[in-house]
UniProtKB/Swiss-Prot annotation:
Belongs to the G-protein coupled receptor 1 family. It comes from Bos taurus. It holds the Pfam family 7tm_1. The gene is NPY2R. It is a multi-pass membrane protein. Its main location: membrane. The chain crosses the membrane at residues 55-75, 90-110, 128-148, 169-189, 220-240, 272-292, 308-328. Residues 76-89, 149-168, 241-271, 329-384 are cytoplasmic. It is found in: Cell membrane. Keywords: Cell membrane, Disulfide bond, G-protein coupled receptor, Glycoprotein, Lipoprotein, Membrane, Palmitate, Receptor, Transducer, Transmembrane, Transmembrane helix. GO terms for cellular component: plasma membrane. GO terms for molecular function: neuropeptide Y receptor activity. A lipid is attached at C345 (S-palmitoyl cysteine). This is Neuropeptide Y receptor type 2. It comes from the Eukaryota.
Length: 384
């Protein structure tokens, strides 16, 4: 899985002509401004056009601005307001940290690389930027999977105890540790070098460099394995979990107005989390599909607008980094109240969870028996 700005580059096995295609667009064998004998002027790739670059600058800057503000706000309210410090919200804050990493460390350099056509940010960032984006995406995927499994365990099986806050911190730490290990090839197998396109003209390249004689096959294996393990499989688990949760909530009959209100809160929270997963899956699908096409058929690299297509799909994928805070504010009243309180610089958030605490504080565990059948009894906790 080739993450970030360097995913649009070919590997170290490219010929000079192929590197020239990357730099100046398909069909070019001369420097910009020069014409081959008896040839017509050729259009360089669209990312070199000023109007396209303006659109790309606006798109990336908007994503960065919205992402930094929104994700910082999510982290702030979870840390500041005690009533927001629930296990689910800790996982949501972890998603925000991962997205913030992409917004601040990856996207500015992605934009710079796209506009300049070569890597001008030095060898350290050559290794760090693709690694950071791969790390963040993998952390997000693991966290979304953990949230789905936790809610499935509590709602479908009516378990009395949820994950404790201490265990949630351990899970978050493990998510970052496992992701750091899985993303490490993106930093290790990379080379920062000068490549001579034509005599007396060099560009700075940051390319994949896999070991062994069959270098290309290792990159393909890693890319396909990452796609399966960190996209297809987790989304399968998440889809299964939320399908069962949705079925359980839809078919449940609540005996009493108080519990019915609590049940509705769970439905709303589940809807919000499902939307987060859908946005993540849909936004990343075009980029994953396009990269899969490249891995299967390298001739895709010969497309005239390959770089523009990759960049557009990358922008779509990055929209997920600012969409989550918008979903929280739109679909969850607790986050909406917390955001407003943060803007007003309020120190407390007394209103939050008030409807839950008043009704259920005296009934931390509510035993419900449906149709007087012992097999239908279950226990609900108040932490939504």
């Amino acid at each position: 899985m080739k993450m970030g700005p360097l995913g649009a580059e070919a590997d170290e096995n490219q010929t000079v002509e192929e590197m020239k295609v990357d730099q100046f667009g398909p069909g070019h064998t001369t420097l910009p401004g020069e014409l081959a004998p008896d040839s017509e002027p050729e259009l360089i790739d669209s990312t070199k056009l000023i109007e396209v670059q303006v659109v790309l600058i606006l798109a990336y800057c908007s994503i960065i601005l919205l992402g930094v503000i929104g994700n910082s706000l999510v982290i702030h309210v979870v840390i500041k307001f005690k009533s927001m410090r629930t296990v689910t919200n800790f996982f949501i804050a972890n998603l925000a940290v991962a997205d913030l990493l992409v917004n601040t460390l990856c996207l500015p350099f992605t934009l710079t690389y796209t506009l300049m056509g070569e890597w001008k940010m030095g060898p350290v960032l050559c290794h760090l930027v693709p690694y950071a984006q791969g790390l963040a995406v993998q952390v997000s995927t693991i966290t979304l999977t953990v949230i789905a499994l936790d809610r499935h365990r509590c709602i479908v099986y009516h378990l009395e105890s949820k994950i404790s806050k201490q265990i949630s911190f351990l899970i978050i730490g493990l998510a970052w540790g496992v992701s750091a290990l899985l993303a490490s090839p993106l930093a290790i197998f990379r080379e920062y070098s000068l490549i001579e396109i034509i005599p007396d003209f060099e560009i700075v390249a940051c390319t994949e460099k896999w070991p062994g004689e069959e270098k290309g096959i290792y990159g393909t294996i890693y890319s396909l394995s990452s796609l399966l393990i960190l996209y297809v499989l987790p989304l399968g688990i998440i889809s299964f979990s939320y399908t069962r949760i949705w079925s359980k909530l839809k078919n449940h009959v609540s005996p009493g107005a108080a519990h019915d209100h609590y049940h509705q809160r769970r439905q709303k929270t589940t809807k919000m989390l499902v939307c987060v997963v859908v946005v993540f899956a849909v936004s990343w699908l075009p980029l994953h599909a396009f990269q899969l096409a490249v891995d299967i058929d390298s001739h895709v690299l010969d497309l005239k607008e390959y770089k523009l297509i990759f960049t557009v799909f990358h922008i779509i994928a990055m929209c997920s980094t600012f969409a989550n805070p918008l979903l929280y504010g739109w679909m969850n009243s607790n986050y909406r109240k917390a955001f407003l309180s943060a803007f007003r610089c309020e120190q407390r958030l007394d209103a939050i969870h008030s409807e839950v605490s008043v009704t259920f504080k005296a009934k931390k565990h509510l035993q419900v028996t449906k149709n007087n059948g012992p097999n239908d009894s279950f226990t609900e906790t108040t932490n939504v």
